[in-house]
A protein has these predicted regions:
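Extended hydrophobic-aromatic, low-complexity segments
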Residues: 285-289, 329-330, 339-343, 359, ...
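Short, surface-exposed amphipathic charged segments that create phosphate/polyanion-binding patches used
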Residues: 272-274, 372-379, 420-426
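Conserved Class I SAM-dependent methyltransferase catalytic core
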Residues: 17, 24, 33-46, 239, ...
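Conserved S-adenosyl-L-methionine
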Residues: 174-278, 283-293, 298-302, 333-334, ...
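Non-catalytic, mostly N-terminal accessory regions of nucleic-acid modification and defense proteins
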Residues: 1-195, 254-267, 361-364, 382, ...
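Hydrophobic alpha-helical scaffolding
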Residues: 129, 149, 203, 231-235, ...
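Accessory, often C-terminal, charged low-complexity segments
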Residues: 282-304, 311, 344, 349-352, ...
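Short, contiguous acidic/charged loop-to-helix segments that flank catalytic cores in large enzymes
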Residues: 28, 287-309, 334-342, 363-369, ...
Length: 524
């Protein structure tokens, strides 16, 4: 009997092969540790390959006697690697029982030899994890196959980006905060256009905002050297991820002296940024003590943000860092659009100060960390009419001081990775073209309000609606089901649920009393 033809094996990409190899670490290390194990090895391989290429070039141009001269490496932004830090040494010892110690030693000596990497690399990390030697050797073999010299295809950047997204996806809801999906970062960059000046991210995670901004500048033939990067990150391991991510791509940045809390230990107190991009933690509770930061200069002119939620703390931190013509694009949970109390007072002041330029509701399931819908806020310190030359292009901005653009992108997006979606290049182009047309002179011909998509609201309209920034309060919806006042509906449900819970507690207390009076006390 003839044998059935075997199915051809599905070819997998280099990234997928690496992911499979990294996946074998499961069981050897905690899930949250995977990314640090793998990405640090990527960095080691990348740094070593660049070093070897530079070493060869020095030898050919100046002779062997200069190959160990550190200055010949640093002048070209290449890290100098002592022999025990080189990838060739690691691979020679990959099957040895003490390979974890050798990797730790390699990373330590690289950081010691290169002040620019201070605080970037793991310290005594691999030895502490007690990773199975065979699994670690297998991972090293896969990483060894990467051709980091393929500049045209940005192999190492591609791999690093792929792994950051996969790790965020794997960690899922409640974790993965170190990573903002690329399509969202691209949207922010395309809207605020960070061509020239200081770019700041107060909660920079693994540095995705910086990486995509530099790609944006490059794609538009701008000069990356005209952009200075400043950032801050609270989590030490993520701070290291960011430093490695930027180093791999040759992006220099000031991330402060250490990983630190942006609110209580601001690493850039006097900074004024031309562009701010951020994805702060959503609805962060107890971010300051009751009597802490009450007279912080970042709140000048505004109410002190409440301790119960950091959303408006992040907003005011961003406002305080904007330069005279600064623009910010950042993400917040939708609740910040309509919060009452202190938040309402701050929001009203922001609107009255002509800082809010655009509010954009994003589709659900864009993020790996939450399934809630999220808002992109655009703040602009100067909404007056002016002429600006950006990247050799003259733009004539009209006065938008008493206007806010509202957009709803919930009908956009394409399926991506399991249950998630992403904004395609076409989606983003549609959004940014509408936004930029609305900003500029001649908008009467190039911009129009579109039901279920966008609406330009006047200050008076916003004031009339109690300074809520919920887009559905302004954008016209053709479908009646879509025209539900979400904010009012949710507050009504909130009130009903509160009444039900109070009634439930009373019923439970009454029931316990009855049983006790019958002599059958119930102890909970």
């Amino acid at each position: 009997m003839a044998r059935a033809a075997s199915k051809p094996k599905k070819e997998i990409s280099m990234e997928e092969a690496l992911w499979k190899s990294a996946d074998k670490l499961r069981g050897s290390v905690e899930p949250a540790e995977d990314k640090h194990v793998v990405l640090s090895l990527f960095f080691l391989k990348f740094a070593s390959d660049k070093f070897e290429a530079q070493r060869k070039a020095i030898s050919e141009k100046y002779g062997e006697k200069f190959v160990d001269n550190v200055a010949f490496y640093t002048k070209d932004n290449v890290f100098f690697l002592p022999e025990i830090s080189r990838w060739s040494f690691i691979m020679e010892n990959a099957k040895q029982d003490d390979i974890a110690l050798k990797i730790d030693t390699a990373l330590y000596t690289i950081e010691k030899a290169n002040p620019a990497l201070k605080g970037a690399l793991p310290d005594n990390y691999y030895s502490r994890l007690h990773i199975d030697t065979a699994k670690l050797a297998s991972l090293l073999d896969e990483i060894d196959k990467i051709n980091t010299g393929d500049k045209e295809n940005d192999i190492i950047g591609r791999v690093y980006e792929y792994f950051l997204s996969k790790f965020a996806l794997a960690e899922g809801k409640g974790k993965g905060e170190f990573y903002t999906p690329k399509c969202i970062v691209n949207l922010i960059a395309e809207m605020i256009e960070p061509y020239d000046g200081i770019l700041y991210d107060p909660c920079c995670g693994s540095g995705g905002m910086f990486v995509q901004s530099m790609k944006f500048v490059e794609a538009h033939h701008g000069n990356k050297k005209k952009v200075s990067i400043y950032g801050q990150e609270y989590t030490n391991t993520t701070y290291k991820l960011c430093k490695m991510n930027l180093a791999i791509r040759g992006i220099s940045a000031n991330l402060g002296e250490m990983a630190a809390n942006t609110f209580t230990n601001d690493q850039h107190k006097d900074l004024k940024a031309d562009y701010i991009m951020a994805n702060p933690p959503f609805n962060q509770k107890e971010w300051r003590g009751d009597n802490e930061l009450t007279d912080d200069p970042r709140w000048d002119g505004y109410e002190v943000p409440p301790t119960s939620n950091a959303n408006y703390g992040w907003i005011l931190n961003i406002v305080s860092k904007l330069s005279q013509n600064g623009v910010a694009g950042f993400l917040l949970a939708n609740g910040a659009l309509s919060d009452d109390g202190t938040e309402l007072k701050i929001r009203r002041q922001l609107i009255e100060n002509n800082l809010v330029e655009a509010i954009i509701i994003l589709p659900r399931n864009l993020f790996y960390t939450t399934d809630i819908s999220v808002t992109l806020w655009i703040l602009n310190k100067n909404k007056k009419a002016r002429v600006v030359e950006e990247n050799s292009e003259v733009k004539r901005f009209r006065n938008r001081e008493r206007e806010i653009l509202f957009m709803d992108l919930r009908q956009m997006g394409s399926p991506y990775e399991k249950k998630y979606i992403e904004l395609t290049e076409e989606d983003r182009a549609k959004v940014t073209s509408v936004y930029h047309a609305w900003q500029q002179e001649g908008y009467e011909e190039t911009y129009q309000n579109v039901p279920e998509f966008c609406y330009s609201a006047s200050f008076d309209e916003v004031a009339e609606k109690g300074f809520t920034l919920v887009p559905s309060r302004y954008i016209e919806f053709v479908n009646r089901d879509e025209n539900i006042d979400f904010d009012t509906k949710m507050k009504m449900l909130q009130s009903e649920l509160r009444d039900l819970l109070v009634a439930e507690e009373k019923s439970k207390a009454d029931l316990l009393t009855v049983f006790k009076e019958l002599g059958y006390e119930i102890e909970l």
